[in-house]
Amino acid sequence: MKTSIAIVDYGMGNLRSVAQALKKAEPAADVAIVDTPAAIRAADRVVLPGQGAMPDCMRSLGESGLQEAVIEASRTKPLLGVCVGEQMLFDWSAEGDTKGLGLLPGKVVRFELDGRLQDDGSRFKVPQMGWNRVRQSQPHPLWDGVPDDAYFYFVHSYYVTPDNPAHTVGETAYGAPFTSAVARDNLFATQFHPEKSAEVGLRLYRNFVHWKP
């Protein structure tokens, strides 16, 4: 029986790219972009993407009527948050003083890198855009087959700061180390974009399809 994966369509996120990457990572999976609570409830696994500003994402999710179904899914099935979809899982964001879903304790803060210089003498830029390494700070099934310190693709100005250090499973350095992947029970989320991260991103998506938390 095929594993069904619902990509939540609340009007914000790189949905087609995520769907294409999941299908490429595991052709046997039944991947669908969905916009109804019933479709989220019917799926075996859920992906919560997000891009842009967290206030816009939270408002759109609330207006879509899908928020309660996402919260319900977070309690009962594997759920993967991507980029702003990761940030939305937390309690609060400094971006627009925005309340999150409160599924993971912690907050979202902005890079404070004004005037800071990188090792090559150039200034740090915010947002961080481009490839950067992810150190696997804790083992996890979604890291299976993904080399430690592999490069993933980032586009963001804000990052999560979990209250519980045990929830951090990936760290990246940009001015200072920050949490770039989190996990707890059936939740996993990344600040980076697996769908833009070549083979290591596809491997992570494939691991999500087969993950049995």
UniProtKB/Swiss-Prot annotation:
Source superkingdom: Bacteria
GO terms assigned for molecular function: glutaminase activity; imidazoleglycerol-phosphate synthase activity; lyase activity
InterPro entries named in the record: Class_I_gatase-like (IPR029062), GATASE (IPR017926), Imidazole-glycPsynth_HisH (IPR010139)
Keywords of the record: Amino-acid biosynthesis, Cytoplasm, Glutamine amidotransferase, Histidine biosynthesis, Hydrolase, Lyase
EC annotation from Swiss-Prot or TrEMBL: 4.3.2.10, 3.5.1.2
A Pfam family per the record: GATase
Any single biological process term in GO: L-histidine biosynthetic process
Start and end residues of each Glutamine amidotransferase type-1 domain: 4-213
Function text: IGPS catalyzes the conversion of PRFAR and glutamine to IGP, AICAR and glutamate. The HisH subunit catalyzes the hydrolysis of glutamine to glutamate and ammonia as part of the synthesis of IGP and AICAR. The resulting ammonia molecule is channeled to the active site of HisF.
Quaternary structure note: Heterodimer of HisH and HisF.
Annotated HAMAP family: HisH
The protein's name in its UniProt record: Imidazole glycerol phosphate synthase subunit HisH
Originating species: Burkholderia lata (strain ATCC 17760 / DSM 23089 / LMG 22485 / NCIMB 9086 / R18194 / 383)
Gene designation per UniProt: hisH
